[in-house]
Amino acid sequence: VAETPAEVVEESVAETPAEVVEESEADNKTVESIPAITIRFAGDSGDGMQLVGTRFTDTSAIFGNDLATLPSFPAEIRAPQGTIAGVSSFQVQIADFDILTPGDNPDVLVAMNPAALKAHLHDLTPNGMLILNEDAFDEKNITKAGYKMDPRDSGELDSYRVFQVPMEKLTKEALKDFDLPGRAVLRS
């Protein structure tokens, strides 16, 4: 048992993924137990990144994890949607030991649109996990973010573990039985 936070960190760093990975026979998925992780949620201001980050943080705390957060939102009153100036983010470091900071570089980046990807990709750790809202990656949003071509096709993301999720489609499907206007559905 570690006596100080420094010893806890040393013990945690000493573990390799091979030591903490186990195979679940029931669903044939690999489960990886890690001592600490830093996650950053990024999207347009108004997309709910602060709310998502807060809910994620609250849920993690319920499970007894230590955590530190870093909300970030633009100083502009309302920058144009889909632009880098309008990107808001929420970073949380979660650990099974005492931590004092929200982490430096995220291990996981959840990018809700191309502008969020452009604003935060440079911070993602090598071989980090990148979760993209594939529904937002249309030609208009890609161009507005300042990309010359779709970053998913350019090779720029090759050094990351990329997961594309149709978040808008899934949200619409989950809320189809509620009497909500289209715009409210995407803000839910």
Regions inferred by a protein language model and the residue ranges of each:
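Active-site cofactor/cluster-binding pocket
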Residues: 2, 19-188
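Threonine-centered tandem repeat motifs in low-complexity domains
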Residues: 4-6, 16
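Periodic low-complexity repeat segments enriched in small/acidic residues
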Residues: 13-14, 26
